[in-house]
Amino acid sequence: AGLPCLTSASDSRTRKTTRTVEAISASKDGRDWMGINQNAANRYFEFFLRNGSLNRLATGEVRREVKLGNSRIDFLVGNTYVEVKTPLITLPAPEGTARVKGSRFQSFDRLIRHMGELKDSLASGKKAKIVLCYLYDANPFTPPRPDGVNNKILDAARAAEIAGVERWQVNLSIDRFGVSLIRYFKSRPYTSGA
């Protein structure tokens, strides 16, 4: 009575399981897939970078895991640092789908550090972008309202944006045939106080 899943095989001897769940479907017929493998998101993103599908976002030589200050940033593409985040906090689900209450993500320290490093990189003439990479066709990201828990991350995001760090969104589609790019776009700016 679980959800339909798309899995991939692994021949690693160190894993506890032989399969990885790549995507789930909240629909019983398994038509609407949502990718959940955050480890794969950077590989997918890199593929679309290298084949030129994301050329409005960044172009140039693609380097992975580039040191910047005290952090490792996912990509340096030409003159642009690109940090990819794959949010799984709110996955779309049909009405009536059970949801866990009170399981809120509250560890933003790494993301805040990355935003600061990206902001600081602008002084050297580099460009910097944070990409929200959704493994389904997500609505354009809207920052949550400040609530006491998320104030630090919202302040860091605003400060990075004011300094010139751009925020982009990439929506990918996963099905049993593979991964495809649905759309990508520069995100709307944060508004003050929201």
Q: Model regions: which residues?
A:
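Conserved mixed alpha/beta catalytic, RNA-binding, or beta-rich assembly cores of soluble enzyme
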Residues: 49, 81, 106-116
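Short histidine-centered catalytic/ligand-binding loop motif
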Residues: 26-36, 93-107
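Short, structured patches in soluble enzyme cores that scaffold and shape functional sites
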Residues: 66, 77, 84-86, 132-134, ...
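Acidic-basic catalytic patches of nuclease active cores, encompassing PD-(D/E)XK
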Residues: 27-64
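Interdomain/boundary linker segments immediately adjacent to catalytic/signaling cores
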Residues: 1-40
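Charge/polar-rich, low-complexity and marginally structured segments
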Residues: 63-73, 108, 118
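Conserved catalytic cores of phosphodiester-cleaving nucleases, focusing on short active-site segments
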Residues: 73-101, 118
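Non-catalytic C-terminal interaction segments of nucleic acid-processing enzymes
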Residues: 116, 122-194
